[in-house]
């Protein structure tokens, strides 16, 4: 029986999951894939819609009752945080209309922690690919962006008001937890799922060209050099194993957010994960 998998079409996800999706991981079952923005997968996971699913770490407090957090396959690192973009030389967001990619995304959670002493007039949830054009056209005063936008935003005539990754790393000393891989309880063994994903990651690193056509086919018109930079930044040591620093980052982010009343209190992410 095929497992249902939901990931984004972003190059880091398709690179990581190429071998698993295409049946090259020994012992793994067939996989049926859905590609969607993380705001969509966050919502779908609340309904238990997928066996394996990529979600925002910010959504974990609402999901861990039904899902295991896997210690691999996700997006966590340094120098890869969300950016707040504007058209001009704005120095704060007081009274601004800000476009964000989702209310339960890690990007928006980091934004709320950073902007605690500011008061944007309005927050609008906007599909990720519409944020930069919308800010450039003046529909929004600022936009919160992730992933490949850090490489391409100057083309839209935009400037970075703040790099939330730099802010988080400087404030906490920890890497930035962005996207997690979850396994639905009762549907898939988390130990087996972890082994499959780690083997898929191993194959991706061993032969990057094997996934090239698949990655580019889903890369939303990204140039090959941007795709390569994207993969190089977001697929890293934490993709293979969250490790001590990775789990510490997740626990620090969710703990700080819970203390601020932004997410429900939850047990340690380590206690709800399968780890080797």
Go through each PLM region and give its residues.
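Bilobed "Venus flytrap"/periplasmic-binding protein-like clamshell domains
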Residues: 2-22, 80-142, 146-151, 248-251
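Beta->alpha turn/N-cap motifs
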Residues: 37-39, 48-61, 127-128, 144-151
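A local structural motif
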Residues: 24-35, 115-126, 263-267
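A structural signal for short loop-to-beta-strand junctions that line the ligand-binding cleft
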Residues: 4, 66-74, 97-98
